[in-house]
Regions:
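Helix-loop-helix hairpin linking two adjacent transmembrane segments in secondary transporters
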Residues: 136-137, 142-202
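Extracytoplasmic gate region of multi-pass secondary transporters
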Residues: 33-34, 157-158, 229-281
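Central cavity-lining transmembrane alpha-helices of secondary-active solute carriers
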Residues: 53-71, 281-293, 372
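C-terminal ends and interior cores of transmembrane alpha-helices
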Residues: 87-102, 312-325
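Intracellular juxtamembrane helix-capping segments at the cytosolic ends
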Residues: 121-135, 341-356
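Hydrophobic core of transmembrane alpha-helices in multi-pass small-molecule transporters
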Residues: 105-122, 328-343
Length: 415
């Protein structure tokens, strides 16, 4: 295997392992949070669109924090950005654990916003950093590999949700307090990791190095026209932001409402609410398998072709989910989980390609696009409240259509 085809190089192996651990940490948080919609619907008698403010608070933090986080890292570096993100993550977890006794949805959302600010800061740092820890040619494979551990953590997150759902025989306030132990443990683990990062050396990739692709032949790279054009004049970047918005919107809606889908009274087969997190874990397991297999496939097939095929299949399968075809609908939904797996990291890598010293700033904008996860779930929940949960799964189809366009044409870097 040539140096250009390697996942990473010897000099960047340990930093890559450390950064990959961060993907695992924020995956646990996301996996657990996606189990909470149905939980709050039951405890506080919320409608589906109201419970979706959980996603609004979490992903709204990404929109608010992405640019400040990017500015912080341009001034102080990736390492301090990672430590800041971990600190906010831990603070949010401790605050949620400490305020559940108030039985207030809005206090919970405020604390979740702080936790989400930490996740946004971590993603703003770790996603672009992982693409630069090795040959430029394997950047998409590298971020997919790192994100596969994120997928593994998403499987574990709903199992934490099982602990929360396990308190079904208690009073409402005691149900909410079932979040204290898992959130406290998460806060302690994240705080410990933050302290470890303060003691470990990490190579700081400068703005100039970001554009040069470590460990590969960079002759002529410095003269790429895309290095000198403003970001707004880079179509592959601008469309990448829109594509990421569409993807995270679709992903968040589908993830958030799977438990509602399998427990909906109009749905066959229908399962008990307390078992909902199991079904979400199955979906996340397929998501992780998709990430790992996608990283391997992209060693032989262009990432854009894989993205095009997967988005086209999602467009074809979502109507099967929506038409209430029993087990076929549930299986189709699980296949969509598998297909979505490679989209975020692939769009991210395509969106920041050949941006040189503007990579950190560009990464901030792409992370801001995660706000799609705040805006779309209330719409999907509103449709589901009016009709049925199954009908709500028609809503993501236009989003995958744009991703298909981006994979076929919109990703191309213009000279």
């Amino acid at each position: 295997m040539t140096n250009k085809n390697k996942l990473t190089t010897k000099e960047f192996l340990m930093p890559f392992i450390l950064i990959t651990s961060l993907f695992f940490l924020w995956g646990i948080a996301h996996g657990m949070i996606d189990t909470l919609d149905k939980h709050f619907q039951q405890i506080l008698n919320l409608k589906k669109w109201q419970s979706s403010f959980i996603q609004f608070s979490l992903y709204g933090a990404y929109f608010v924090m992405a640019l400040p986080a990017g500015y912080f890292m341009r001034r102080f570096g990736y390492k301090k950005g990672i430590i800041l993100g971990l600190s906010l993550f831990a603070a949010g977890a401790f605050l949620i654990a400490g305020t559940t006794s108030f039985e207030s949805f809005w206090i919970f959302l405020t604390c979740l916003f702080i936790l989400g600010s930490g996740l946004a800061t971590l993603e703003t740092a770790a996603n672009p950093y992982s693409t630069k820890l090795g040959p430029q040619e394997s950047a998409a494979r590298r971020i997919n590999f790192a994100q596969s551990f994120n997928g593994l953590a998403w499987i574990i997150g709903p199992l934490i949700g099982l602990y929360i759902y396990g308190n079904q025989n208690n009073a409402a306030g005691e149900k909410l307090t079932s979040m204290i132990l898992p959130l406290s443990i998460i806060g302690l683990v994240v705080l410990t990791v933050a302290l470890i990062f303060t003691r470990l050396p990490l190579p700081e990739i400068t703005e100039e190095e970001v554009g040069l692709g470590h460990g590969i032949d960079v002759s002529g790279v410095e003269d790429k026209p895309s290095f000198h054009k403003p970001l707004i004049n880079q179509p592959h970047f601008v469309l990448g932001v829109v594509a990421q918005f569409c993807y995270v919107a679709a992903q968040t809606g589908i993830f958030s409402y799977l438990i509602n889908f399998v427990t909906d009274e109009s749905q066959y087969p229908r399962f008990e609410v307390k078992n909902g997190p199991y079904f979400l874990s199955i979906g996340f397991a397929l998501f992780m398998i998709g990430r790992m297999s996608g990283s391997y496939i992209m060693g032989f097939v262009k990432p854009t072709r894989v993205l095009a095929l997967y988005s086209a299949l999602c467009i074809l399968l979502l109507p099967v989910v929506s038409l209430e075809m029993g087990w076929f609908s549930l299986i189709a939904l699980y296949v969509v989980f598998f297909l979505m797996s490679i989209m975020f990291p692939t769009i991210f890598a395509l969106g920041i390609k050949d941006l040189g010293p503007k990579t950190k700033k560009a990464a901030s904008f792409i992370v801001m696009a995660v706000v799609g996860g705040a805006i779309f779930p209330p719409l999907m929940g509103w449709i589901s409240d009016i009709y049925t949960m199954s009908v709500g799964f028609f809503a993501p189809i236009p989003l995958f259509l744009f991703i298909l366009y981006y994979s076929l044409k919109g990703h191309q870097v213009k000279a």
